[in-house]
Each structure stands twice: as C-alpha cells, then as structure tokens.
Amino acid sequence: PDEHLSVSRTSLFTRTDTRVRYRGSLADLKGYTIGVVAGFSYGTLFDNADYLKKEEVQNTRRLISMVVSGRLPLGIENEAVIRGVAGSLGVAGSIRFLNPPVHSRKLYAGFSRRLELRKLAEEFSRSLKDFKNSGEYRDILRKYDVSHSELTRQREKTSGS
C-alpha cells in the first residue's frame, strides 16, 4: 500500500532534569555513555558510531531504570516502546526525548504481489488514509500519548524516503 501505518522513531532519552547538548549530530554525544539494549540495532549510523561509548543492558525496563536513577545519562530505543514501558513503570514523567530522532522509518502493511491482491492493497491504503484523518484516530493517539501534530511532522519529514 502507498499509505504507511505509522512512523517508527529511534530516539535518545534522558531524565527530565539532565542537560544534554544534542542538535542531531551523534558527535555531540562523545562525552556521554549511552545505554543500549543488547542485540538491538538502532540504525546503521548509530550502530557504526564506534567513537560513542555504549553500555549494553539486558532489556528495556533495565535501560529505563538506569536512566531514571542517573546510572546512565542517556538511553536509546524505539520511542513508542519507551513511552509504553516507562508508563507501566510509573516513570513516564521522569524522562524526556531528545530531538531529532536518531533514526526513523515508515512502517507498512505487507501484501502479496499477486495481481488479484493489488486492488485489496489499494483499498486498504485509501481506507487507512481516511481513518488517519478521522477523530477516532486522534482519540486513539491521545489515549496512548502520541500527538497528531508529531505524527504529521514525522510524515512530512519522511515523505521523501
């Protein structure tokens, strides 16, 4: 389909009271230790940044707790995952995300390339686009603390990719 489901953003996060100078260049982060979940990829640019000090942790819950406790100044992970896990841990108000994201990409539903499914994919894309313009969609985003303007900005930024 032409219409993407959402945008996946891999972002840096820190405590709300921690000052970090980051303007979108990974070189800005040379003096910091960045928590990463072992075995995960955070985009080629970050993964290949050997000049950064990265500390592996077992899982996302541990990553968040180490950042919130001050044991790590920064963490990196999928933004939606961090929001969800931090919310379940009751610490969502203790962290903030740094902009811009380190990596982002559109997520699509996959359909077989068989000719008879092409029409279904086109209908799905049209219906998804209509749904994204609905109040129901905005209500869902609000429920899960995702701003519509944030998604619109991401859609505009990634429309060329």
Predicted feature descriptions by range:
Residues 41-54, 94, 128-161:
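Ligand-binding clefts/hinges and TM-proximal coupling segments of bilobed small-molecule sensing domains
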Residues 36, 52-66, 99:
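Short beta-strand-to-loop elements that line the ligand-binding cleft
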Residues 6-11, 87-125, 147-160:
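Periplasmic-binding protein-like
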Residues 17-20, 32-33, 110-147:
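Extended ligand-binding regions for polar small-molecule ligands
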Residues 13, 35-36, 75, 110:
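Short, well-ordered beta-strand segments
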